[in-house]
Amino acid sequence: MASTPPTAARRSVAGYASPLAQPTPYTPPAPVAPSPAESLPALPVPTRKGRTISLWLFGVLGFLLIALVGYFVWALGSFASVVGLVLALIPLTIVFLGVRLIDRWEPEPKRLVAFAIAWGAVAAVGLTLLVDTALTLLLGIRSEEFGAVVQAPVVEELWKGLGVFLIFLLARRAFDGPVDGIVYGALVGAGFAFTENIQYFGVSLIEGGGEQLTVTFVVRGLLSPFAHAMFTAITGFAIGMVARRHGSARAAAGAGALGLVGAILLHALWNGSATFADFFGLYFTLQVPLFIGFILGIVALRREEARLTRARLEDYAAAGWFTPQEVTMLATPGGRKVGLAWASQLRGDRRPLMRAFIKDATELASVRQRAITGRDPMAVNDERALLIRTRATRAALLAY
Protein backbone atom coordinates (compact mmCIF):
# COMPACT_ATOMS: atom_id res chain seq x y z
CA MET A 1 0.00 0.00 0.00
CA ALA A 2 1.48 3.38 -0.99
CA SER A 3 2.66 5.70 1.76
CA THR A 4 1.30 8.73 -0.05
CA PRO A 5 -2.10 8.94 -1.74
CA PRO A 6 -2.19 8.72 -5.51
CA THR A 7 -3.24 11.66 -7.59
CA ALA A 8 -6.82 10.40 -7.71
CA ALA A 9 -7.01 10.81 -3.94
CA ARG A 10 -6.59 14.56 -4.32
CA ARG A 11 -9.64 14.80 -6.50
CA SER A 12 -13.03 15.50 -5.01
CA VAL A 13 -15.54 12.67 -4.56
CA ALA A 14 -18.91 14.31 -5.00
CA GLY A 15 -21.48 14.28 -2.24
CA TYR A 16 -19.43 12.79 0.61
CA ALA A 17 -19.39 14.26 4.12
CA SER A 18 -16.53 13.43 6.48
CA PRO A 19 -14.71 14.97 9.46
CA LEU A 20 -12.51 16.76 6.93
CA ALA A 21 -15.48 18.51 5.32
CA GLN A 22 -15.09 22.19 4.44
CA PRO A 23 -17.67 24.74 3.32
CA THR A 24 -19.24 24.07 -0.06
CA PRO A 25 -18.52 23.82 -2.94
CA TYR A 26 -15.48 21.83 -1.75
CA THR A 27 -16.24 18.19 -0.99
CA PRO A 28 -13.35 16.07 0.30
CA PRO A 29 -12.39 12.63 -0.92
CA ALA A 30 -12.31 9.54 1.23
CA PRO A 31 -9.92 9.82 4.19
CA VAL A 32 -6.32 9.31 3.09
CA ALA A 33 -4.66 6.17 4.40
CA PRO A 34 -1.79 6.71 6.84
CA SER A 35 1.68 5.40 6.21
CA PRO A 36 2.04 1.64 6.72
CA ALA A 37 4.99 2.41 8.97
CA GLU A 38 2.67 3.82 11.62
CA SER A 39 1.68 1.46 14.43
CA LEU A 40 -1.83 0.02 14.26
CA PRO A 41 -4.26 1.35 16.89
CA ALA A 42 -6.40 -0.98 18.98
CA LEU A 43 -9.15 -2.75 17.06
CA PRO A 44 -12.48 -1.03 17.85
CA VAL A 45 -15.95 -2.47 17.60
CA PRO A 46 -18.20 -0.49 15.22
CA THR A 47 -21.07 1.29 16.94
CA ARG A 48 -24.38 -0.59 17.00
CA LYS A 49 -26.70 2.32 17.70
CA GLY A 50 -29.49 2.43 15.16
CA ARG A 51 -28.66 -1.05 13.87
CA THR A 52 -30.70 -3.30 16.13
CA ILE A 53 -34.03 -3.80 17.88
CA SER A 54 -34.61 -2.97 21.54
CA LEU A 55 -34.89 -5.90 23.92
CA TRP A 56 -38.28 -4.74 25.20
CA LEU A 57 -39.79 -5.50 21.80
CA PHE A 58 -38.59 -9.08 22.11
CA GLY A 59 -40.24 -9.13 25.54
CA VAL A 60 -43.56 -8.11 24.01
CA LEU A 61 -43.18 -10.78 21.34
CA GLY A 62 -42.40 -13.33 24.04
CA PHE A 63 -45.64 -12.49 25.84
CA LEU A 64 -47.60 -12.80 22.60
CA LEU A 65 -45.89 -16.12 21.90
CA ILE A 66 -47.14 -17.55 25.18
CA ALA A 67 -50.67 -16.44 24.31
CA LEU A 68 -50.38 -17.94 20.83
CA VAL A 69 -49.13 -21.28 22.16
CA GLY A 70 -52.08 -21.36 24.54
CA TYR A 71 -54.44 -20.69 21.65
CA PHE A 72 -53.05 -23.54 19.55
CA VAL A 73 -53.15 -26.03 22.41
CA TRP A 74 -56.74 -25.01 23.16
CA ALA A 75 -57.89 -25.07 19.52
CA LEU A 76 -55.93 -28.05 18.16
CA GLY A 77 -54.81 -30.04 21.16
CA SER A 78 -51.25 -30.85 22.15
CA PHE A 79 -50.64 -33.70 19.71
CA ALA A 80 -51.90 -31.94 16.56
CA SER A 81 -50.04 -28.77 17.57
CA VAL A 82 -46.74 -30.62 17.96
CA VAL A 83 -47.18 -32.47 14.65
CA GLY A 84 -48.00 -29.19 12.92
CA LEU A 85 -45.00 -27.52 14.52
CA VAL A 86 -42.56 -30.20 13.40
CA LEU A 87 -43.85 -30.22 9.83
CA ALA A 88 -43.96 -26.41 9.65
CA LEU A 89 -40.25 -26.29 10.44
CA ILE A 90 -39.49 -27.88 7.05
CA PRO A 91 -40.79 -25.08 4.78
CA LEU A 92 -39.45 -22.50 7.24
CA THR A 93 -35.99 -24.01 6.89
CA ILE A 94 -36.28 -24.04 3.09
CA VAL A 95 -37.20 -20.36 2.99
CA PHE A 96 -34.60 -19.38 5.57
CA LEU A 97 -31.81 -21.03 3.61
CA GLY A 98 -33.04 -19.33 0.43
CA VAL A 99 -33.03 -15.94 2.15
CA ARG A 100 -29.51 -16.57 3.45
CA LEU A 101 -28.36 -17.00 -0.15
CA ILE A 102 -29.90 -13.65 -1.02
CA ASP A 103 -28.35 -12.03 2.04
CA ARG A 104 -24.90 -13.57 1.65
CA TRP A 105 -23.27 -10.50 0.08
CA GLU A 106 -23.90 -8.24 3.08
CA PRO A 107 -25.55 -10.26 5.89
CA GLU A 108 -28.06 -8.48 8.11
CA PRO A 109 -27.56 -8.33 11.90
CA LYS A 110 -28.65 -11.55 13.60
CA ARG A 111 -30.96 -9.77 16.03
CA LEU A 112 -32.84 -8.14 13.15
CA VAL A 113 -33.16 -11.50 11.41
CA ALA A 114 -34.59 -12.98 14.60
CA PHE A 115 -36.97 -10.04 15.05
CA ALA A 116 -38.25 -10.27 11.47
CA ILE A 117 -39.07 -13.97 11.83
CA ALA A 118 -40.56 -13.45 15.29
CA TRP A 119 -42.73 -10.56 14.14
CA GLY A 120 -44.19 -12.63 11.32
CA ALA A 121 -44.62 -15.77 13.42
CA VAL A 122 -46.05 -14.12 16.52
CA ALA A 123 -47.18 -10.50 16.20
CA ALA A 124 -48.54 -10.57 12.64
CA VAL A 125 -50.37 -13.86 13.21
CA GLY A 126 -51.78 -12.75 16.56
CA LEU A 127 -53.00 -9.41 15.20
CA THR A 128 -54.51 -11.14 12.17
CA LEU A 129 -56.43 -13.53 14.42
CA LEU A 130 -57.76 -10.59 16.45
CA VAL A 131 -58.93 -8.72 13.36
CA ASP A 132 -60.46 -11.83 11.79
CA THR A 133 -62.35 -12.59 15.00
CA ALA A 134 -63.57 -9.00 15.27
CA LEU A 135 -64.79 -8.95 11.67
CA THR A 136 -66.63 -12.22 12.18
CA LEU A 137 -68.32 -11.06 15.39
CA LEU A 138 -69.09 -7.49 14.36
CA LEU A 139 -69.88 -7.87 10.66
CA GLY A 140 -70.83 -11.53 10.48
CA ILE A 141 -68.37 -12.18 7.64
CA ARG A 142 -68.18 -15.95 7.22
CA SER A 143 -67.67 -16.42 3.48
CA GLU A 144 -64.61 -18.59 2.84
CA GLU A 145 -64.15 -17.09 -0.63
CA PHE A 146 -64.25 -13.52 0.70
CA GLY A 147 -61.90 -14.45 3.51
CA ALA A 148 -59.37 -16.07 1.20
CA VAL A 149 -59.35 -13.55 -1.65
CA VAL A 150 -60.10 -10.24 0.11
CA GLN A 151 -59.85 -10.36 3.88
CA ALA A 152 -56.73 -12.50 4.27
CA PRO A 153 -54.57 -10.61 1.74
CA VAL A 154 -55.47 -7.19 3.17
CA VAL A 155 -55.23 -8.01 6.87
CA GLU A 156 -52.22 -10.32 6.71
CA GLU A 157 -50.12 -8.12 4.43
CA LEU A 158 -50.91 -5.06 6.52
CA TRP A 159 -49.53 -6.58 9.71
CA LYS A 160 -46.59 -8.22 7.99
CA GLY A 161 -45.69 -4.98 6.22
CA LEU A 162 -45.84 -3.14 9.54
CA GLY A 163 -43.06 -5.39 10.81
CA VAL A 164 -40.80 -4.43 7.89
CA PHE A 165 -41.56 -0.75 8.45
CA LEU A 166 -40.72 -1.09 12.15
CA ILE A 167 -37.32 -2.51 11.25
CA PHE A 168 -36.74 0.47 8.98
CA LEU A 169 -37.74 2.93 11.71
CA LEU A 170 -35.83 1.33 14.58
CA ALA A 171 -32.74 0.07 12.75
CA ARG A 172 -32.54 2.11 9.57
CA ARG A 173 -28.73 2.06 9.55
CA ALA A 174 -29.02 -1.66 8.80
CA PHE A 175 -31.60 -1.02 6.06
CA ASP A 176 -29.46 0.01 3.09
CA GLY A 177 -31.52 -0.76 0.01
CA PRO A 178 -33.97 -2.99 -1.86
CA VAL A 179 -32.05 -6.22 -1.20
CA ASP A 180 -32.23 -5.58 2.54
CA GLY A 181 -35.94 -4.84 2.19
CA ILE A 182 -36.52 -8.09 0.34
CA VAL A 183 -34.57 -10.00 3.01
CA TYR A 184 -36.53 -8.51 5.91
CA GLY A 185 -39.85 -8.87 4.09
CA ALA A 186 -39.16 -12.48 3.15
CA LEU A 187 -38.19 -13.32 6.74
CA VAL A 188 -41.36 -11.75 8.11
CA GLY A 189 -43.38 -13.69 5.55
CA ALA A 190 -41.54 -16.91 6.40
CA GLY A 191 -42.33 -16.45 10.08
CA PHE A 192 -46.00 -15.83 9.32
CA ALA A 193 -46.22 -18.89 7.07
CA PHE A 194 -44.56 -21.00 9.78
CA THR A 195 -47.27 -20.28 12.36
CA GLU A 196 -50.05 -20.44 9.78
CA ASN A 197 -48.78 -23.83 8.64
CA ILE A 198 -48.93 -25.15 12.20
CA GLN A 199 -52.64 -24.38 12.17
CA TYR A 200 -53.28 -25.77 8.68
CA PHE A 201 -51.35 -28.96 9.33
CA GLY A 202 -52.99 -29.47 12.72
CA VAL A 203 -56.51 -28.95 11.36
CA SER A 204 -55.80 -31.31 8.44
CA LEU A 205 -54.64 -34.01 10.83
CA ILE A 206 -57.73 -33.62 13.01
CA GLU A 207 -60.25 -33.49 10.17
CA GLY A 208 -58.78 -35.90 7.62
CA GLY A 209 -56.03 -37.85 9.31
CA GLY A 210 -52.70 -38.65 7.71
CA GLU A 211 -54.00 -38.61 4.12
CA GLN A 212 -55.34 -35.06 4.24
CA LEU A 213 -52.31 -33.92 6.21
CA THR A 214 -50.03 -35.26 3.48
CA VAL A 215 -51.89 -33.36 0.76
CA THR A 216 -51.84 -30.13 2.77
CA PHE A 217 -48.15 -30.51 3.53
CA VAL A 218 -47.24 -31.09 -0.12
CA VAL A 219 -49.29 -28.12 -1.34
CA ARG A 220 -48.24 -25.63 1.35
CA GLY A 221 -44.89 -26.95 2.51
CA LEU A 222 -43.30 -28.18 -0.71
CA LEU A 223 -45.06 -26.59 -3.68
CA SER A 224 -45.42 -23.08 -2.31
CA PRO A 225 -43.15 -22.50 0.70
CA PHE A 226 -42.05 -19.10 -0.64
CA ALA A 227 -45.54 -17.65 -1.17
CA HIS A 228 -45.78 -15.47 1.95
CA ALA A 229 -42.11 -14.59 1.67
CA MET A 230 -42.65 -13.25 -1.87
CA PHE A 231 -45.75 -11.24 -0.91
CA THR A 232 -44.12 -9.35 1.94
CA ALA A 233 -40.84 -9.01 0.06
CA ILE A 234 -42.68 -6.68 -2.33
CA THR A 235 -43.42 -4.32 0.56
CA GLY A 236 -39.82 -4.62 1.73
CA PHE A 237 -38.51 -3.90 -1.75
CA ALA A 238 -40.54 -0.68 -1.94
CA ILE A 239 -39.27 0.53 1.45
CA GLY A 240 -35.74 -0.46 0.49
CA MET A 241 -35.83 1.68 -2.64
CA VAL A 242 -36.48 4.71 -0.45
CA ALA A 243 -33.88 3.60 2.11
CA ARG A 244 -31.18 3.62 -0.57
CA ARG A 245 -31.91 7.22 -1.54
CA HIS A 246 -32.51 9.28 1.60
CA GLY A 247 -34.20 7.24 4.33
CA SER A 248 -37.06 9.61 5.20
CA ALA A 249 -39.68 7.90 7.37
CA ARG A 250 -42.50 9.66 5.54
CA ALA A 251 -41.16 8.63 2.14
CA ALA A 252 -40.66 5.07 3.37
CA ALA A 253 -44.25 4.97 4.62
CA GLY A 254 -45.52 6.16 1.24
CA ALA A 255 -43.41 3.70 -0.69
CA GLY A 256 -44.35 0.96 1.75
CA ALA A 257 -48.03 1.69 1.12
CA LEU A 258 -47.49 1.26 -2.63
CA GLY A 259 -45.58 -1.94 -2.02
CA LEU A 260 -48.37 -3.10 0.26
CA VAL A 261 -50.88 -2.70 -2.56
CA GLY A 262 -48.70 -4.90 -4.77
CA ALA A 263 -48.34 -7.48 -2.00
CA ILE A 264 -52.10 -7.56 -1.42
CA LEU A 265 -52.86 -7.95 -5.13
CA LEU A 266 -50.35 -10.77 -5.56
CA HIS A 267 -51.62 -12.48 -2.41
CA ALA A 268 -55.22 -12.20 -3.62
CA LEU A 269 -54.26 -13.55 -7.05
CA TRP A 270 -52.42 -16.45 -5.44
CA ASN A 271 -55.31 -17.33 -3.12
CA GLY A 272 -57.83 -16.86 -5.90
CA SER A 273 -56.05 -19.37 -8.10
CA ALA A 274 -56.49 -21.96 -5.36
CA THR A 275 -60.07 -20.97 -4.53
CA PHE A 276 -61.77 -20.45 -7.88
CA ALA A 277 -59.65 -22.36 -10.40
CA ASP A 278 -57.67 -25.52 -10.96
CA PHE A 279 -54.80 -25.14 -8.49
CA PHE A 280 -52.27 -27.31 -10.29
CA GLY A 281 -53.10 -25.82 -13.69
CA LEU A 282 -52.56 -22.28 -12.48
CA TYR A 283 -49.63 -23.35 -10.36
CA PHE A 284 -47.54 -24.08 -13.44
CA THR A 285 -48.96 -21.31 -15.64
CA LEU A 286 -49.03 -18.50 -13.07
CA GLN A 287 -47.32 -19.24 -9.78
CA VAL A 288 -44.15 -20.85 -11.13
CA PRO A 289 -43.52 -18.00 -13.64
CA LEU A 290 -44.05 -15.49 -10.83
CA PHE A 291 -41.51 -17.29 -8.70
CA ILE A 292 -38.99 -17.41 -11.56
CA GLY A 293 -39.49 -13.70 -12.19
CA PHE A 294 -38.95 -13.05 -8.50
CA ILE A 295 -35.64 -14.94 -8.58
CA LEU A 296 -34.45 -13.10 -11.70
CA GLY A 297 -35.26 -9.77 -10.06
CA ILE A 298 -33.24 -10.70 -6.99
CA VAL A 299 -30.27 -11.74 -9.14
CA ALA A 300 -30.34 -8.34 -10.87
CA LEU A 301 -30.50 -6.54 -7.52
CA ARG A 302 -27.63 -8.60 -6.15
CA ARG A 303 -25.48 -7.61 -9.12
CA GLU A 304 -26.34 -3.97 -8.56
CA GLU A 305 -25.41 -4.35 -4.89
CA ALA A 306 -22.02 -5.82 -5.85
CA ARG A 307 -21.45 -3.01 -8.37
CA LEU A 308 -22.20 -0.41 -5.70
CA THR A 309 -19.83 -2.11 -3.26
CA ARG A 310 -17.05 -1.98 -5.83
CA ALA A 311 -17.69 1.67 -6.66
CA ARG A 312 -17.49 2.71 -3.01
CA LEU A 313 -14.37 0.65 -2.30
CA GLU A 314 -12.72 2.22 -5.34
CA ASP A 315 -13.18 5.57 -3.58
CA TYR A 316 -11.04 4.25 -0.74
CA ALA A 317 -8.56 2.70 -3.15
CA ALA A 318 -8.07 6.14 -4.67
CA ALA A 319 -7.18 7.40 -1.18
CA GLY A 320 -4.71 4.58 -0.56
CA TRP A 321 -6.71 2.36 1.80
CA PHE A 322 -6.96 -0.57 -0.63
CA THR A 323 -5.07 -1.68 -3.70
CA PRO A 324 -7.01 -2.18 -6.96
CA GLN A 325 -6.37 -5.90 -6.62
CA GLU A 326 -7.91 -5.90 -3.15
CA VAL A 327 -10.99 -4.11 -4.45
CA THR A 328 -11.47 -6.81 -7.08
CA MET A 329 -11.03 -9.49 -4.44
CA LEU A 330 -13.44 -7.87 -1.97
CA ALA A 331 -16.14 -6.69 -4.37
CA THR A 332 -16.65 -9.64 -6.74
CA PRO A 333 -17.96 -13.15 -6.00
CA GLY A 334 -15.05 -14.73 -7.86
CA GLY A 335 -12.55 -12.54 -6.07
CA ARG A 336 -13.93 -13.53 -2.68
CA LYS A 337 -13.60 -17.21 -3.54
CA VAL A 338 -9.99 -16.72 -4.63
CA GLY A 339 -9.24 -14.73 -1.49
CA LEU A 340 -10.68 -17.39 0.79
CA ALA A 341 -8.79 -20.12 -1.05
CA TRP A 342 -5.55 -18.14 -0.68
CA ALA A 343 -6.19 -17.53 3.04
CA SER A 344 -6.76 -21.25 3.62
CA GLN A 345 -3.20 -21.94 2.44
CA LEU A 346 -1.62 -19.52 4.90
CA ARG A 347 -0.15 -20.69 8.17
CA GLY A 348 -2.94 -21.60 10.59
CA ASP A 349 -5.75 -21.39 7.97
CA ARG A 350 -6.65 -17.70 7.98
CA ARG A 351 -10.04 -17.96 6.31
CA PRO A 352 -11.78 -16.51 9.39
CA LEU A 353 -9.58 -13.42 9.05
CA MET A 354 -10.35 -13.19 5.34
CA ARG A 355 -14.08 -13.47 6.05
CA ALA A 356 -13.76 -10.66 8.59
CA PHE A 357 -11.82 -8.58 6.04
CA ILE A 358 -14.54 -9.12 3.43
CA LYS A 359 -17.34 -8.41 5.91
CA ASP A 360 -15.81 -5.18 7.21
CA ALA A 361 -14.93 -3.94 3.71
CA THR A 362 -18.49 -4.59 2.52
CA GLU A 363 -19.90 -2.79 5.53
CA LEU A 364 -17.46 0.06 4.89
CA ALA A 365 -18.83 0.42 1.36
CA SER A 366 -22.37 0.58 2.77
CA VAL A 367 -21.34 3.18 5.34
CA ARG A 368 -19.83 5.35 2.61
CA GLN A 369 -22.97 5.04 0.51
CA ARG A 370 -25.07 6.18 3.48
CA ALA A 371 -22.71 9.12 3.97
CA ILE A 372 -22.87 10.09 0.30
CA THR A 373 -26.67 10.14 0.39
CA GLY A 374 -26.60 12.13 3.65
CA ARG A 375 -28.93 9.80 5.53
CA ASP A 376 -26.64 8.63 8.34
CA PRO A 377 -25.13 11.16 10.76
CA MET A 378 -23.20 8.32 12.45
CA ALA A 379 -21.45 7.29 9.23
CA VAL A 380 -18.23 9.11 10.09
CA ASN A 381 -17.82 7.17 13.34
CA ASP A 382 -18.51 3.84 11.65
CA GLU A 383 -16.17 4.71 8.81
CA ARG A 384 -13.31 5.48 11.17
CA ALA A 385 -13.76 2.25 13.12
CA LEU A 386 -14.10 0.10 10.01
CA LEU A 387 -11.04 1.59 8.35
CA ILE A 388 -8.99 0.75 11.43
CA ARG A 389 -10.44 -2.75 11.52
CA THR A 390 -9.66 -3.44 7.87
CA ARG A 391 -6.07 -2.28 8.30
CA ALA A 392 -5.63 -4.45 11.38
CA THR A 393 -7.20 -7.47 9.70
CA ARG A 394 -4.98 -7.09 6.64
CA ALA A 395 -1.93 -6.89 8.89
CA ALA A 396 -3.00 -10.09 10.66
CA LEU A 397 -3.55 -11.83 7.33
CA LEU A 398 -0.08 -10.95 6.10
CA ALA A 399 1.74 -11.56 9.38
CA TYR A 400 4.30 -14.37 9.48
Please annotate each region the language model reported.
Residues 1-400:
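Hydrophobic alpha-helical segments at protein termini of multi-pass membrane proteins
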